[in-house]
A protein has these predicted regions:
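Short glycine/serine-rich loop segments
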Residues: 107-232, 418-430, 434-439
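An N-terminal boundary/leader segment
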Residues: 1-61, 276, 285, 289-291
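Acyltransferase
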Residues: 27-35, 64, 272-298, 321-331, ...
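A short helix-breaking turn/cap at a secondary-structure junction
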Residues: 196-283, 301
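Acidic/His- and Gly-rich active-site-bordering loop/insert found
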Residues: 59-61, 69-141
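Short helix-loop capping/hinge segments that flank enzyme active sites or metal/cofactor-binding pockets
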Residues: 3-7, 75-95, 254-263, 314-370, ...
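Glycine-rich, small-residue loops and helix-cap segments
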Residues: 26, 77, 117, 171-172, ...
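A short acidic, glycine-rich active-site loop
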Residues: 99-105, 150-153, 399-412
Length: 451
């Protein structure tokens, strides 16, 4: 049974661009838009568990403070959410963990400031698995976040709370970030648009910029390509790195004939689910019908690349575990960490001597991956090897070896773009026989989001 608030009121089915225009035109006020979103949240979140803390009164006050025709920002007064691994003044940043402090943050983080500059008003913070370390949103410290298409299924992760509440019609757009697929995977599971932008496109956490390879990208999940494009156009008015070609305003399809590489197999995923393969191949045929060239390719990935990436991923868990007091303050309690985090930490400690060579190989992989785009414009793949999985399949309390193998197979197609720093988007272009969304991924070369 689907869980939806889309038809609770006249605003529930509108996208963010339409709500922003309605506020600007005086059709309704920002306060009415925010109040309606809060009511929609309260109607579905007892089932979905997508929000971890609220700021309803502050959001309503911010909306009331806007001029009747908005502030001039494209999303002025549009209600939204910030993922709970990003600082928002007055709210704690728990990172999906019982080990972090419940004390509120003194100020907004860098990304939050850019997010707010577009006019979006956060009504609260959305759920994630502990430290965003897995592809489902089932933290042990609170109820699992459920998929609005079928609450017995996973939303994906790690931006599962944002995806669930956008898909359910609570808000039209919400913050997400991606260190191995965490924008694209929830978008695929919940039938949304999820773009992981090029490295550096938006401000990330300070710790990410200090990593040997910055695999993290900030972004949003939305219900329309138009909203995603409008968000990046608005955000780069406030954060436009000189080293990156601007995305600019994208309001219509391009006219260029594109060279598309098609890959529906993966050495780590094994044989993908037939429904996933059929959907990706159907999209390839549609691209050919539009005049684009499609050719089969093999991705430059192997088990060594996966082992190197997951060692790097485990390094992040070890940093959270053993350096948590430095990162999160003296109230951090590592005794409260979940089994997946502690096992990943041990995985890294037992193999940390391999880390320098793993990083070197990952950097070479990034070069090899980017080289694909000397002959291609886009690469078309599944987002996930199967349709969304049931809750429990990736439970963080599972035996570690089982959890790791399941995760590697399920999410094999998304880490390459994090290592390479290149953009990739999940598009909701199909459904399984069970009625669950199937996401299709288009990946491009560095700074080629417009394609």
């Amino acid at each position: 049974m689907q869980v939806s608030a889309h038809t609770n009121d006249v605003l529930g089915e509108l996208d963010a661009v339409s709500i922003g225009r309605g506020i600007s035109a005086g059709d309704f006020t920002a306060q009415e838009a925010v109040s309606a979103a809060i009511a929609r949240l309260q109607s579905v979140d007892p089932v979905l568990h997508g929000m971890v803390c609220e700021r309803f009164e502050l959001a309503l006050a911010e909306a009331a403070g806007l001029p009747a025709s908005g502030s001039g920002a494209p999303f002025a007064g549009v209600p939204s959410l910030i993922k709970d691994n990003t600082d928002v003044a007055g709210l704690p940043t728990r990172q999906g963990s019982a080990g972090t402090s419940p004390e509120p943050m003194a100020e907004d983080g860098d990304f939050t400031r850019t997010f707010r500059a577009t006019g979006l008003i956060p009504i609260g913070k959305s759920s994630l698995p502990e430290f965003g370390l897995t592809a489902t949103t089932e933290p042990l410290s609170r109820p699992a976040t459920r998929n609005p298409w079928n609450p017995a299924y996973s939303t994906g992760g790690s931006s599962g709370g944002s995806a669930a509440l956008v898909a359910a019609g609570v808000v039209p757009i919400a913050h997400a970030n991606d260190g191995g697929g965490s924008i694209r995977i929830p978008a695929a599971c919940c039938g949304l648009v999820g773009l992981k932008p090029s490295r550096g496109r938006l401000p990330t956490m300070a710790v990410a910029d200090k990593m040997p390879i910055n695999i993290l990208a900030e972004g949003v999940v939305t219900r329309s390509v138009a909203d995603t494009a409008a968000f990046y156009a608005a955000a780069e008015r406030h954060h436009a790195p000189a080293s990156l070609m601007p995305v600019g305003s994208v309001t219509s399809p391009g006219e260029q004939r594109l060279r598309i590489g098609l890959c529906v197999g993966h050495p780590l995923a094994g044989a993908c689910d037939p429904e996933v393969v059929a959907q990706v191949e159907q999209v390839a045929r549609q691209c050919e019908a539009l005049g684009h060239g499609v050719q089969p390719i093999a991705l430059p990935v192997d088990r060594q690349m996966a082992d190197d990436f997951f060692l790097y991923w485990a390094r992040l868990a070890a940093a959270m575990n053993y350096l948590g007091k430095m990162a999160f303050g003296r109230d951090f309690d590592r005794r409260q960490l979940e089994p997946l985090t502690t096992h990943l930490s041990k995985h890294y400690l037992w193999r940390c001597w391999r880390s320098p060579m793993a990083i070197r190989r990952l950097r070479q992989f990034a070069v090899n991956y980017q080289a694909l785009f000397t002959e291609l414009d886009l690469v078309l793949t599944p987002v996930l090897a199967t349709p969304p999985v049931e809750l429990g399949y990736l439970d963080p309390a599972l035996d570690f070896a089982t959890a790791l193998e399941r995760l590697i197979r399920y999410a094999a197609f998304t880490p390459p773009q994090n290592v390479a720093g290149t953009p990739a988007i999940s598009l909701p272009l199909g459904r399984s026989s069970d009625g669950l969304p199937i996401g299709v991924q288009f990946a491009a070369g560095m700074v080629q989001e417009r394609r």
